[in-house]
Curated annotation (Swiss-Prot):
GO terms for molecular function: 3-isopropylmalate dehydratase activity. PANTHER family: 3-ISOPROPYLMALATE DEHYDRATASE SMALL SUBUNIT (PTHR43345:SF5), 3-ISOPROPYLMALATE DEHYDRATASE SMALL SUBUNIT 2-RELATED-RELATED (PTHR43345). Belongs to the LeuD family. LeuD type 1 subfamily. Keywords: Amino-acid biosynthesis, Branched-chain amino acid biosynthesis, Leucine biosynthesis, Lyase. This is 3-isopropylmalate dehydratase small subunit. The keyword Lyase applies. It is an enzyme of class 4 (lyase). The keyword Glycoprotein does not apply. GO terms for biological process: L-leucine biosynthetic process. Pathway: Amino-acid biosynthesis; L-leucine biosynthesis; L-leucine from 3-methyl-2-oxobutanoate: step 2/4. InterPro entries: 3-IsopropMal_deHydase_ssu, Aconitase/3IPM_dehydase_swvl, AconitaseA/IPMdHydase_ssu_swvl, IPMI_Swivel, LeuD.
Amino acid sequence: MEPLVTHKGKAAVLNRINVDTDQIIPKQFLKRIERTGYGRFAFFDWRYLADGSPNPDFELNQPIYEGSSILIAGENFGCGSSREHAPWALDDYGFKIVIAPSFADIFHQNCFKNGMLPIRLDYDVWKTFAASYENKGYEMTVDLEKQQIEDHEGNITPFDVDPHWREMLLNGYDEISLTLLLEDDIQAFEDKRSSWLRA
């Protein structure tokens, strides 16, 4: 994965609570195991009308949000089934960071595992961000190293992130590459095993 240290991008607001993974990526599109190609199906039932044309009333279809890479979402984002396709779809859509008051636990972990940064903010702080950025097309800068967000006016907001996941994103590690960093320790342990336990 690519390291994520700082990211500057346009923020889009999807102010809906309890957005579940089936709304993020409907089940009929989960027939592939590749991680790419899901962006066009993200929020499919909201994003398109019955005839396949874009729904002009869907928030993320507003021209002001075109090219957004930061999603300001509502409470309990990513609830529902634990499909990893949900962060795949968001990432392929173009989102690298999701900011919300709360996330479903499995979705929260799946974001980190797929190189995305989910940021939890206290509700009142999140509410200010949502109001400031709704239908504006403003940019913000997220600094994972400093654990802070700089808004379009230069205001700084700190955020917390688990040290383990922070280190993974800063270095671009996935779980396999992190395990390989311990290859010497693993081999040393294996060498100490009794011969009849070795493959």
